[in-house]
């Protein structure tokens, strides 16, 4: 396993991945996907949320982040960036500023955003939305009312919101729906 050093911290970078072949593990050029937690803020209150107990590291130092992205690109090991939270769309201006920074460094960078769909109509105001690799929207029930109950919030995307967002995109496949199936939601 290769190791890289960033800001006096050594990090391992995998040089293998799992496959469905009999040997199951295949060696490859070391690559990584950078995960950026934009915020801890979220207007949902999911019972199963893993971010409830997560530590708030404050705001992102964009200069340091730009350094890290450039460094990983120079090493030729960065294959994409995922932006998560909390809920990234509680801070759309910061999200779009972050995306602008990423695309200024590499206009072809694969960038994915994970969201519960809160404020998703704001994406139409971002001129580079069609450059995104994907927008992963969490849905836990097909019925909007039941979905809001599971999220314990009325601030999440409705089916209509998602359809409107998809309608504004050139590539309709950018939208991915992520679902967590729970026993309490299956029969409702």
State where each predicted segment sits.
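Canonical radical SAM enzyme core domain
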Residues: 55-67, 88-134, 139-146, 153-161, ...
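Acidic (Asp/Glu)-rich catalytic clusters
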Residues: 71-75, 126-131, 165-171
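Short, basic/glycine-rich phosphate-binding loops at helix/coil junctions
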Residues: 46-49, 76-78, 143
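Canonical Radical SAM [4Fe-4S] cluster-binding loop centered on the CxxxCxxC motif
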Residues: 23-63
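Short Fe-S-cluster ligation motifs
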Residues: 71-87
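Hydrophobic faces of well-ordered beta-strands that scaffold small-molecule active sites
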Residues: 32-36, 79-83, 111-113, 135-137, ...
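N-terminal [4Fe-4S]-dependent radical SAM core
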Residues: 1-36
């Amino acid at each position: 396993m290769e190791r890289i050093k960033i800001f006096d911290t050594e990090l391992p970078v995998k040089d293998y991945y799992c496959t469905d072949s009999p040997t199951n593990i295949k060696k490859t050029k070391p690559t990584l996907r950078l995960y950026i937690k934009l915020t801890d803020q979220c207007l949902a209150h999911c019972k199963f949320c893993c971010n409830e107990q997560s530590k708030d590291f404050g705001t992102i130092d964009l200069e340091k982040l730009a350094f890290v992205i450039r460094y990983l690109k120079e090493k030729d090991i960065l294959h994409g960036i995922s932006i998560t939270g909390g809920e990234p769309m509680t801070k759309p201006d910061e999200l779009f500023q972050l995306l602008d920074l990423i695309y200024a460094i590499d206009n072809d960078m694969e960038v994915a955003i994970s969201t519960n769909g809160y404020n998703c109509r704001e994406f139409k105001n971002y001129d580079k939305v069609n450059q995104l690799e994907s927008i992963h929207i969490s849905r836990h029930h097909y019925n909007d009312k039941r979905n809001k109950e599971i999220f314990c919030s009325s601030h999440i995307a409705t089916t209509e919101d998602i359809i409107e967002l998809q309608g504004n995109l050139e590539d309709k496949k950018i939208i991915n729906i992520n679902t967590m199936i729970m026993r309490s939601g299956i029969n409702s």
